[in-house]
Amino acid sequence: MEHLKKVIISKRAELAAKGGHPWIYGTEIEHADEGIEAGDIVRVESKKGKFVGSGFYNPHSKITVRIFSTNANDTFNAAFWKRRAAYAVDYRLQVMRKEDYDCCRLVFGEADQLPGLTVDRFGDVLSVQVLSLGMERHKKEFLDGLIEVLRERQLAVSCVYERNDVKIRELEGMQQYKGFYRSPLLDPAAEKTRVDIVEN
């Protein structure tokens, strides 16, 4: 269990969070410890001091906390993010037909307890979009873990392309950009992949 700075939320927000709603709005925060920086992971507690969850904190966003864990014993290291990647991948392997898996949404934000993160798979290419500052800060750990998980399951990954050219990122205090996170292999087929991704 990590020692995290605390955020105390209203009774209404507590009930919503316990019901599965992962967003805490700024107006629902009763108290936040000093020294919390945008993008930090915080411990969310009720007014009575009960653990509600852990989430990404961003005072620049109307959604000030995005809860992504309800296990008080979680430690948010590389192993944690790889486990999250494995949960997302394995769930889809269980519920999808094999032929559909070559073109699918691997990660769908809050539905996979990965706030603001979308990952689409097109064959051996991953297209990634990050819309929350906290997830941006842990992007490398997650994506490196995801690539490992896919390869462990004999699912090839030639490149990862980031499509972070959306205005909503600015509301989180992030810049817009797009480009390769993990470049494709330098062969004719990979070069065609590079062109297709960038143009589409």
Residue ranges and their predicted role:
Residues 1-123, 152, 192:
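Non-catalytic accessory regions of SAM-dependent methyltransferases
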